[in-house]
């Protein structure tokens, strides 16, 4: 009987310890997630800059200094530092990097150890060259009418070819017929007039001899009577 009450209270103590360990593990996991969220938000606040872009600062320095041969890196650096005081600690390195980048892109011109802005005359020239390129495709539609007008020439050529072919065919067809049929006819026709000419020649001299004898008698008889009277 004495053994039963000793074994009963041991079971609830083990369950309480397990529950305490579970709550501690849950409490430790919560702050780790919060730290990750805070670390992601911090870089956004650092990205804002209080000064304009490097191209604006450099172009402003070159235009205000107005040097004939261009402004050196030292002069640009000094001008920007005097005007903009909230600059990063590595401003000089960044300035050199951006100067090289702008020269490579064509926004700046490097002359020996100085930098200049591109000439104002060279900038509008490409703009003027681009404007005429836009209307050219529209004008290109006009030659289409010329091409359409050129089509009748091709038709005329085809018609000329067809006429030439028809003429050649027409010439070939009659050339074959007269060779067989007309070869014998001209001979017979030519032979008949020869006979007629001979008969006419034979008959004509007999008539000519009889006619003048009669005319002489009739003409002379009245003339002799009148003279005698």
From Swiss-Prot:
User: Which GO cellular component terms are attached?
Assistant: nucleosome; nucleus
What SMART domains is this protein classified in? Answer: H15
> What highest taxon heads this organism's lineage?
Eukaryota
This entry's Gene Ontology molecular function terms read: double-stranded DNA binding; nucleosomal DNA binding; structural constituent of chromatin
- This chain's source organism reads Euphorbia esula (Leafy spurge)
Record SUPFAM superfamilies: Winged helix' DNA-binding domain (SSF46785)
Biased composition range(s): Low complexity:
125-138, 161-177, 185-205
Give a short account of what the protein does: Histones H1 are necessary for the condensation of nucleosome chains into higher-order structures.
Stretches for region Disordered: 1-52, 125-229
Ranges where the H15 domain occurs: 50-119
Single GO BP term: negative regulation of DNA recombination
Q: What is its main location?
A: nucleus
Keywords attached to this entry = Chromosome, DNA-binding, Nucleus
**Membership in a protein family:** Belongs to the histone H1/H5 family.
Q: What is this protein called?
A: Histone H1
Q: Where in the cell is it found?
A: Nucleus; Chromosome
**Residue ranges with Basic residues bias:** 32-45, 139-160, 206-229
């Amino acid at each position: 009987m004495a053994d039963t009450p000793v074994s009963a209270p041991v079971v609830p103590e083990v369950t309480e310890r397990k529950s305490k360990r579970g709550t501690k593990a849950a409490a430790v996991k919560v702050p780790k997630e919060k730290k990750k969220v805070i670390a992601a938000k911090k870089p956004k606040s650092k990205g804002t800059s209080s000064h304009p872009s490097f191209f604006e600062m450099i172009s402003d320095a070159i235009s205000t200094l107005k040097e004939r041969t261009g402004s050196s890196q030292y002069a640009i650096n000094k001008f920007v530092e005097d005007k903009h005081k909230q600059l990063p600690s590595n401003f000089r390195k960044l300035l050199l990097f951006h100067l090289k980048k702008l020269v490579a892109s064509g926004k700046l011109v490097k002359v020996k150890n100085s930098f200049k802005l591109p000439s104002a005359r060279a900038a509008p020239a490409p703009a003027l060259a681009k404007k005429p390129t836009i209307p050219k495709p529209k004008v290109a539609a006009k030659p289409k009418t010329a091409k359409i007008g050129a089509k009748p020439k091709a038709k005329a050529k085809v018609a000329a070819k067809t006429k030439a072919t028809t003429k050649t065919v027409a010439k070939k067809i009659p050339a074959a017929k007269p060779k067989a049929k007309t070869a014998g006819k001209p001979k017979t026709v030519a032979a008949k007039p020869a006979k007629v000419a001979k008969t006419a020649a034979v008959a004509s001299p007999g008539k000519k001899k009889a006619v003048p004898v009669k005319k002489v008698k009739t003409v002379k008889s009245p003339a002799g009577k009148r003279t005698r009277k």
